[in-house]
Every structure is written in structure tokens, then in C-alpha cells.
Curated annotation (Swiss-Prot):
GO terms for molecular function: 5S rRNA binding; structural constituent of ribosome. This is Large ribosomal subunit protein uL18. Disulfide bonds: none annotated. The keyword Phosphoprotein does not apply. The gene is rplR.
Length: 119
């Protein structure tokens, strides 16, 4: 019998492999991306202290509206970059969360770069 591969399980395994190698510090925090079927979330995390420094998602009150999921991801990238720069964060380590660097993840990353985050 052929069994179907659970994509999320494989993604979590990939993410765990990446997380063993990268970690966010206070001077260079980690920009983490989580993507569900409907929404996208981004957090700037200091792993040393275990603190989220800035976050954004398309569920935020000041988000507005977006025509597509990719458009929403780029707006979330703008929001998280602005909130991080308000806290004095300019340089981050990008953690794509085990997702491919394509589509919504790529749109979020490029928008964050355009709005002042370096990675």
C-alpha cells in the first residue's frame, strides 16, 4: 500500500535541521516566517533571551486588505520591517521555517529587505 507523505511533517523536520544551525541574538535576531493555508505570520525573535521583539501578520488590525496571498505576504514583510526598525533592529537572520524560498515566503522576504531589514 502506498502511503501519502505528510508535507508538514517533512517541513518540520527540515526546519529543525535549519534551526540547529541558526539562532537569533539580541544584536542580530531571527526573522521567522510561518505560513498557513490562509494567513502568514512573521516574528523577529531573540533566541538567547527567548523574546519576540517584533511581529506582524495579515490578521493585524492595521493591516488593511490585500488582493492575493502573495500581496498579503509582501504587506506583512513591510509591517514587520517597520516594527523592527522602530525598535532599532536593522540586521536579521532569515528563517524561512522549512518552506521553499518561493511565492509568499519570497514576497515577504523581499518586502522586508526593501523596507530596511538586512539579511
Amino acid at each position: 500500500m502506498i502511503t501519502k507523505i505528510d508535507k508538514n511533517k517533512v517541513r518540520k523536520k527540515r526546519h529543525a535541521r535549519v534551526r540547529s544551525k541558526i539562532s537569533g541574538t539580541e544584536s542580530r535576531p531571527r526573522l521567522n516566517v510561518f505560513r498557513s493555508n490562509k494567513n502568514i505570520y512573521a516574528q523577529v525573535i531573540d533566541d538567547v533571551n527567548g523574546v519576540t521583539l517584533a511581529s506582524a501578520s495579515n490578521l493585524d488590525k492595521d493591516f488593511g486588505s490585500a488582493e492575493s496571498k502573495v500581496d498579503a505576504a509582501s504587506k506583512v514583510g513591510e509591517l514587520v520591517a517597520k516594527r523592527a526598525s522602530e525598535k532599532g533592529i536593522t540586521s536579521v537572520t532569515f528563517d524561512r521555517g522549512g518552506y521553499l524560498y518561493h511565492g509568499r515566503v519570497k514576497a515577504l522576504a523581499e518586502a522586508a529587505r526593501e523596507n530596511g531589514l538586512e539579511f
